[in-house]
């Protein structure tokens, strides 16, 4: 197996849900982009994909969000699907969990789920846990709009909540907050219009590790394990910012498309043998 930087330039009707062990979870939309018509796991290195049956909660008029995880205890992949009323960003209605080995979905009790989640922000997987951001219905608080970190234990199928550090501004519209992997641990990226903060979890508290004086709002791409942060350049292309030296270098002068998903890809032979009871296909087929 070998590792590569992976940039995924998806057509408008495809979304990468997540990536684990050489396998990407991909969701395909119909033209209206509200109802997924296909969910599949894809191994780009061998161009093999396996179709996942749709969760029972998928229906017209609702948005279905997915998260991708791996259970290291049972060596099994799982997908978490959550349903929202179309146009409503935060209020969760139903949750289903797909288990790869069983090829089936089951409902998660809704009272165990947070009522407020931000469906638009990315999810991050690390060491058997899926992380995403929770929402505070009262935005003008010290924590701001994004109030807590939600984690889902893939093995135990249980949710946990961690309060996030206070924001420095209240009610600001130019603010992004999402989980990242930093030094092999979960961390938080706080992006404002003029600067960005990186918070790490240490001894059950949040510690601000870096302040980056760059305009990264809607320009952040990926934080590499070597401490180089990739972001879109002011004139197009992709730049690299080193957290320690603060040096900025041009990685690519221009890109035809902005990557919709970026990660460290590891080649593997997963999905090579296929499954007797599932639709395995070549992707892309051209």
Where are these predicted regions, by residue range?
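Short, conserved recognition motifs on repeat-domain binding surfaces
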Residues: 1-286
């Amino acid at each position: 197996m070998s590792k590569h930087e992976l940039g995924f330039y998806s057509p408008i009707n495809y979304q990468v849900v997540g990536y684990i062990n050489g396998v990407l979870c991909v969701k395909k939309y119909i033209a209206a982009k509200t109802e997924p018509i296909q969910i599949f796991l894809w191994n780009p290195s061998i161009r093999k994909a396996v179709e996942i049956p749709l969760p029972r909660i998928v229906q017209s008029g609702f948005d279905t969000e997915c998260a991708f995880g791996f259970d290291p205890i049972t060596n099994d992949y799982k997908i978490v699907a959550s349903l929202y009323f179309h146009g409503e960003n935060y209020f969760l209605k139903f949750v289903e969990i797909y288990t790869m080995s069983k090829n089936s979905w089951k409902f998660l009790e809704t009272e165990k789920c947070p009522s407020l989640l931000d469906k638009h922000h990315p999810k991050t997987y690390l060491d058997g846990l899926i992380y995403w951001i929770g929402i505070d219905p009262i935005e003008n608080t010290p924590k701001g709009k994004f109030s807590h970190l939600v984690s889902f234990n893939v093995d135990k199928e249980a949710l946990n909540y961690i309060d996030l550090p206070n924001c420095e501004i209240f009610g600001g519209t130019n603010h992004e907050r999402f989980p990242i992997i930093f030094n092999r641990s979960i961390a938080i990226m706080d992006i404002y219009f003029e600067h960005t903060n990186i918070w790490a979890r240490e001894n059950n508290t949040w510690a601000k590790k870096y302040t980056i004086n760059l305009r990264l709002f809607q320009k952040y791409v990926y934080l590499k394990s070597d401490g180089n942060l990739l972001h879109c350049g002011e004139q197009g292309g992709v730049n690299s910012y080193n957290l320690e030296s603060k040096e900025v270098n041009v990685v690519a002068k221009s890109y035809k498309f902005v990557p919709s998903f970026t990660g460290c890809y590891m080649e593997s032979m997963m999905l090579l043998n296929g499954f007797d009871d599932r639709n395995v296909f070549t992707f892309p087929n051209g």
